[in-house]
Amino acid sequence: MQLVEQSKRATYIGTGRRKSSVARVRLVPGTGQLTINGKSGELYLQFNPTYLAIAKAPLESLGLENDYDILVNTSGGGLTGQADSIRLGVARALCQLDPENRKPLKVEGYLTRDPRAKERKKYGLRKARKAPQYSKR
């Protein structure tokens, strides 16, 4: 009986990516709790207020931080990339919730996928661009 009630609740889905992180985000009507990979958001993001603020930023900009629970499955990368990928996923889910949300989120920059990623190492070099020391003689 409870499963039927839970499946009837409106769920909004968004996917976010940043560096090598991928976050699959679900917004469910609730009290504003953040759950990442089955853990509380505070615990998963190591109680770092910056990461928590980044992840919840799109909801706060629209004044909906206490209206929806954020359920996230994330993998790859580190905490910074995961927090940014969660932010993009939440913003995309909010656009699905109401197309009117798109413009304010776009102005804030929450719908922009950050294309910066680690550049591959090239052969003959020590890193992506660092060359071995050059000796003229």
UniProtKB/Swiss-Prot annotation:
It comes from the Bacteria. Residues 105-117 have a biased composition (Basic and acidic residues). NCBIfam families: PRK00132.1. This is Small ribosomal subunit protein uS9. PROSITE patterns: RIBOSOMAL_S9 (PS00360). Pfam families: Ribosomal_S9. GO terms for biological process: translation. Residues 105-137 are annotated as: Disordered. Keywords: Ribonucleoprotein, Ribosomal protein. One of its GO terms (cellular component) is cytosolic small ribosomal subunit. GO terms for molecular function: RNA binding; structural constituent of ribosome. HAMAP family: Ribosomal_uS9_B. The gene is rpsI. Residues 118-137 have a biased composition (Basic residues). Belongs to the universal ribosomal protein uS9 family.
